[in-house]
Amino acid sequence: MTYEESVKYLYKIAGFAKKSSLEDINYLLEQLGNPHKDLKFVHVAGTNGKGSVCAFLEAVLKEHGKTTAAFTSPHLVKVNERIRLNGQDISDERFKDACNRVKECVEAAVEKGVNQPSFFEMMFLMALCIMEEEQPDICLIETGMGGRYAVSYTHLTLPTI
C-alpha cells in the first residue's frame, strides 16, 4: 500500500473493529516477533496532560543525549504525529512500511479468528514495530484504548519507569 492507502485503510477500520482482547494483542505481538521485548519504556498515564508530559520528557531526554521514540494520541493534523522519533514525526514512508507490516500480520491472524484490531491498536502495533527498528534509548508510551489496558500496557511493555 502507498502512504495514502495506508491512512485510508486505518480510518476504514475505525468504523467496524471491536476492541481486541489482551490475548489478541499478545498473539499479534508474538506474530510480529515481540517488537517490544528489548525496549525500555516510560509509560505515561493519567486523565489529562499525557501528551504534554511525553513532549517534555522527549525534550529533557534529548538534552541529556538520549534517543527517544514516542507514541501519543490524538493527532491534530496528520496521523504521523502519533509516532515520533527524537521529537520528529515519522515520515510517510516509515508510516507506510509499518502499516504494511502490521496489516499483513493482522490479516493472517483474523483468518485464524483473532479480532480485527481497532485504529488505536493498529497504531500501537505500528509504533512498537518502528521502535524495534529504531532501538531508541527510551520509548514513551501514552496510555490509550480508553484506559482499558492501562495495567496491560504495563505488562506488555515492561516499563522502565
Give short role names for the model-derived ranges.
Residues 1-48, 52-67, 76-78, 135:
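N-terminal leader/targeting and accessory segments in enzymes
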Residues 8-9, 41, 82, 111, ...:
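General secondary-structure edge motif
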Residues 22, 29-30, 34-37, 63-153:
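ATP-dependent carboxylate-amine ligase catalytic core
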Residues 154-160:
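Conserved small/polar residues in nucleotide/adenosyl-binding loops
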